[in-house]
Amino acid sequence: MKGVISQVMGPVVDVDFNDYLPKINEAIEVYFEVEGKKNRLILEVAAHLGDNRVRTIAMDMSEGLTRGLEATALGAPISVPVGEKVLGRIFNVVGDLIDEGEGVEFDKHWSIHRDPPPFEEQSTKSEIFETGIKVVDLLAPYAKGGKVGLFGGAGVGKTVIIMELIHNVAFKHSGYSVFAGVGERTREGNDLYHEMKESNVLDKVALCYGQMNEPPGARNRIALTGLTMAEYFRDEMGLDVLMFIDNIFRFSQSGAEMSALLGRIPSAVGYQPTLASEMGKFQERITSTKKGSITSVQAVYVPADDLTDPAPATVFAHLDATTVLNRAIAEKGIYPAVDPLDSTSRMLDPQILGEDHYKVARGVQAVLQKYKDLQDIIAILGMDELSEEDKLTVDRARKIERFLSQPFFVAEVFTGSPGKYVSLEENIAGFKGILDGKYDSLPEAAFYMVGNIDEALAKAEKLKA
């Protein structure tokens, strides 16, 4: 099982073996010294070159590696710790703790390369995953075991929504979450850890980080590390898990780097020729089974805002819902800044949601769309030139817009107002009332930053006083 390093080209390392040939994806361990410090490096077999030579991808920096160093094939792929002990801790791609906390003995390890659940075990039920966030549950609901794309520029609130979802899953569904930082900025990973600590959600989430400064192997495989931890919660503990990936684009990007390093001929826009199959293999593992489910929320960076770029276009094929954050909405002070007209979901179907929910959702969208169409007239001629019917539409649309805002639990520290979880029934009832004109006499301000409609009524009473 011992081999010798024969070539080092940055993150690509060739290893020669005599009487043993490691399988593709098998892990190889190397110990070496740099400036008197002993380092352990894991390599993953990517190609067989013939003559018992394998080409591997390094999972960490390869500085200090030299030809002739001894390498040991481990006989199995990279395996990472799983189970409840991983909660509240930060791991790197090979499952080592990197949070400088106390050491833990993990009794269970799973390989990061796994097959998706067989068809007969997969659940075919279309169920809604209640998040407690009004705008999401009403207009672009998430599917249990589905995949959601979270689109938004910098500073619009992607991280806050992710943290609120982790909070609501922990407290309402008493479920666990896994966060995979794929090609994240180290600063963002650090901020997220401290924000979670302050918001008291850390003990319900496992964090896996492969930062921007790490080699492509680590940035690519970190997504599999996180997914493996989530699969254990689903398959062995029968839980509904939430899996966050930030950012799924970096998964494709690091795959392209690895592909080029291995000498494969690039495909469109320089991406790897295996882009669609790599993404498919990964996304197929995120699914509902009869035991439990993994619902994933994936932040998607769109290079140069070009939605036809192969990387985001490949992700779209797998998504069940999209939550689009809009800077213009954030500038109005409406948080979460989810765009009610741009966000979509395949769950928005009367056969899944029921006629009532569907009608209210479509009614809300129709009113908001009409308001959007009237904005030019209002800007040029003012409100007085509108017909009575249009004035009423604008009035209701402005109330709906404000009622789509909501105080978050994880933002209590900044806003000073306590967070609210709104159940689906209360959510539908509130918006139905606005559409039916029940609350036409109430001031707009009563609907801003409240939970359910009863709170809006109480706020209106306060404003009167």
Swiss-Prot record:
GO CC, alphabetical: plasma membrane; proton-transporting ATP synthase complex
Catalysed reaction, written as an equation: ATP + H2O + 4 H(+)(in) = ADP + phosphate + 5 H(+)(out)
Binding, ATP: 152-159
Mode of membrane association: Peripheral membrane protein
Record-level Gene Ontology MF annotations: ATP binding; ATP hydrolysis activity; proton-transporting ATP synthase activity, rotational mechanism
Assigned keywords, A-Z: ATP synthesis, ATP-binding, Cell inner membrane, Cell membrane, CF(1), Hydrogen ion transport, Ion transport, Membrane, Nucleotide-binding, Translocase, Transport
A Pfam cross-reference name: ATP-synt_VA_C
Subcellular location as annotated: Cell inner membrane
SMART domains: AAA
InterPro entries associated with the record: AAA+_ATPase, ATP-synt_VA_C, ATP_synth_F1_bsu, ATPase_a/bsu_AS, ATPase_alpha/beta_chains, ATPase_F1/V1/A1_a/bsu_N, ATPase_F1/V1/A1_a/bsu_N_sf, ATPase_F1/V1/A1_a/bsu_nucl-bd
Enzyme Commission code: 7.1.2.2
CDD domains reported for this sequence: ATP-synt_F1_beta_C, ATP-synt_F1_beta_N, F1-ATPase_beta_CD
Record family assignment: Belongs to the ATPase alpha/beta chains family.
NCBIfam families, per database record: atpD
Matches recorded under HAMAP family: ATP_synth_beta_bact
Binding partners and assembly: F-type ATPases have 2 components, CF(1) - the catalytic core - and CF(0) - the membrane proton channel. CF(1) has five subunits: alpha(3), beta(3), gamma(1), delta(1), epsilon(1). CF(0) has three main subunits: a(1), b(2) and c(9-12). The alpha and beta chains form an alternating ring which encloses part of the gamma chain. CF(1) is attached to CF(0) by a central stalk formed by the gamma and epsilon chains, while a peripheral stalk is formed by the delta and b chains.
Function: Produces ATP from ADP in the presence of a proton gradient across the membrane. The catalytic sites are hosted primarily by the beta subunits.
Name of the protein described by the UniProt record: ATP synthase subunit beta
